[in-house]
UniProtKB/Swiss-Prot annotation:
It is found in: Nucleus. It comes from Schizosaccharomyces pombe (strain 972 / ATCC 24843). This is mRNA 3'-end-processing protein yth1. A zinc finger (C3H1-type) spans 48-75, 76-104, 105-130, 131-157. The keyword Metal-binding applies.
Amino acid sequence: MTDYIKDKAIAADFSSVQFRFDNYLKQNFNFGRSALLNSGNGRDSGSKMGSVVCKHWLRGLCKKGEQCDFLHEYNLKKMPPCHFYAERGWCSNGEECLYLHLDPSKQVGVCAWYNMGFCPLGPICRGKHVRKPRPCPKYLAGFCPLGPNCPDAHPKHSEPPHPPQKRKDW
């Protein structure tokens, strides 16, 4: 009898199960879009091609549809910043640029308190809270041969910086 139950449990078929949030995930996060996208067959989900808006789609002329390697949405969160605009303040592609044009003067700086280890304002802080993977054990012991090129955090324990400021939208 246990073999019968074991066979039924293993042979369960959930391919017809649909959740209410499936369409949301497909539209916003490209989950379940295509097996080719996640299998690495010529398209790496972490590559630049998956984060650049399709120039043909912008004009309504993309013939590839779902098979296109580029984004078919104008989502600012997924677009990488334009290197030329960030460096020079202008881009020769102008409005047709496939990358995000961020104004360097409006960029938010890194929070000095968070870099020291803890920011008392937490999510309402005005600065960026950039995580480093973990403290470098060699640096904590006294010396890290990699210096600033070390992938781990080198915490700076100095006098506290100026008091952190709250975000304007809070």
